[in-house]
Swiss-Prot record:
The keyword Phosphoprotein does not apply. GO terms for biological process: DNA recombination; DNA repair. Disulfide bonds: none annotated. This is Holliday junction branch migration complex subunit RuvA. Residues 65-143 are annotated as: Domain II. It comes from Lachnospira eligens (strain ATCC 27750 / DSM 3376 / VPI C15-48 / C15-B4) (Eubacterium eligens). It is found in: Cytoplasm. SMART domains: HhH1 (SM00278).
Length: 207
């Protein structure tokens, strides 16, 4: 099994890249977001891969991080989700956002992904929820935030959400209710953690 391929980026197409290593060009299917995050052709890249073997075909699916690859592997373990469907899903949602959606029983967010209907969305939640732990999801998200630009608005919003959910869980609310309540708070980017927490608490009282 190939864990990753490190070599020269030879070609970039919308959903496929070619990486040359030791004189061999590897055709690798990637999420739609990956081409825009890659360096220029000719640069060295490291792509974490999954090899899908069929009777008449052998395909490589690649990701920029082990975390994304891990989420991909979890998705294809769900009955009815193949590599192409999993790749399509991760082209439209980050691994962290998908985890939060699963923990929050957010069927609407998951069924909005291409190729995923209501029944499949429910199946994803049922089959993956027991494999995810809230503290590990937060740790992963916060770790990525620390690596991001401290002035990044997206990073700041994620940290505020995480702080609010953690506070609600510490107050005795379930992770599902906490996630749903915080998600419903509007205009988070213009609010601090305390304000978001107060508004989320008001929503929980109405539940």
């Amino acid at each position: 099994m190939i864990s990753y391929i490190k070599g020269e980026l030879a070609e970039i197409l919308p959903d496929v890249i070619v990486v040359e290593a030791n004189g061999i060009g590897y055709n690798i299917y990637v999420p739609g977001s990956v081409p825009g995050e890659l360096p220029s052709v000719g640069s060295e890249v490291k792509i974490y891969t999954y090899m899908n073997v069929k009777e008449d075909e052998c395909s490589l699916f690649g990701f920029l991080t082990r975390d994304d690859l891990s989420m991909f592997k979890m998705l294809i373990c769900v009955n009815g989700i193949g590599p192409k469907a999993a790749l399509g899903a991760l082209s439209n949602i980050t691994a962290d956002d998908l985890r939060f959606a699963v923990l929050a029983d957010d069927v609407a967010a998951i069924k909005a992904l291409p190729g995923i209907g209501p029944k499949t969305a429910q199946k994803i939640i049922i089959e993956l929820k027991d494999k995810l732990k809230l503290d590990e999801v937060f740790e992963s998200a916060l770790s990525k935030n620390k690596k991001a630009d401290n002035n990044s608005n997206v990073s700041n919003v994620m940290m505020i959400r995480n702080d609010a959910v953690e506070a609600l869980v510490s107050l005795g609310y379930s992770s599902k209710d906490a996630l749903v309540a915080v998600k419903e708070v509007e205009d988070i980017e213009n609010k601090d953690s305390e304000t978001v927490l107060k508004e989320a608490l008001k929503k929980l009282v109405k539940f």
